[in-house]
Design a protein with these regions (language model features):
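Active-site nucleotide-donor binding segment shared across nucleotidyl transfer reactions
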Residues: 91-142
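Helical scaffold of the NTase/Pol beta-like nucleotidyltransferase catalytic core
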Residues: 2-6, 17-108
Length: 143
């Protein structure tokens, strides 16, 4: 059987948990569990932002201690700051590339962030992935 911390993490890992998932999370979070272990697991699995958002949305962040709340909140807002910076950089890059009439395709994180997560604090990105046809590569490198 899974640990209570794992079950909480699983219940809180949906981007938009439905009513049934919310009720399950409420039931689990009201039980006794290792708060430090829960937060460590969330950080390790890359879902600290989701855990923070969903516990806050349900109004149950108070079940965690002050240090755990601060840690989750810090991860969420750090991811948001980093992602906003990357989005700003991407906008500048695409404006320059667009002036050169070069077509690029966004890959991996940025499209997921915008189309799936719809919240810049849920998943920290570390880079911008672009796909460029080989014949356009010299033009992109010059810009």
């Amino acid at each position: 059987m899974s640990s209570i911390e794992y079950q909480i993490l699983l219940a809180a890992s949906d981007i938009e948990p439905g009513m049934e998932q919310q009720q399950k999370l409420l039931g689990l979070i009201s039980q006794e569990f290792d708060q430090g272990r829960l937060v460590e697991m969330a950080v390790r699995e890359g879902v600290a932002g989701l855990l923070y958002k969903n516990l806050k949305k349900l109004g149950v962040l108070g079940y965690l201690g002050h240090r755990q709340i601060e840690k989750l909140q810090s991860f969420y807002y750090s991811a948001a700051r980093l992602n906003l910076k990357l989005l700003h950089d991407l906008k500048e890059i695409l404006q320059i590339i667009d002036q050169s009439k070069i077509r690029v395709v966004l890959l991996q994180g940025i499209p997921l962030l915008q189309q799936i997560y719809k919240d810049v604090g849920l998943r920290p990105l570390t880079d911008i992935d672009l796909w460029v046809l080989p014949e356009y590569l010299p033009g992109v490198e010059r810009t």
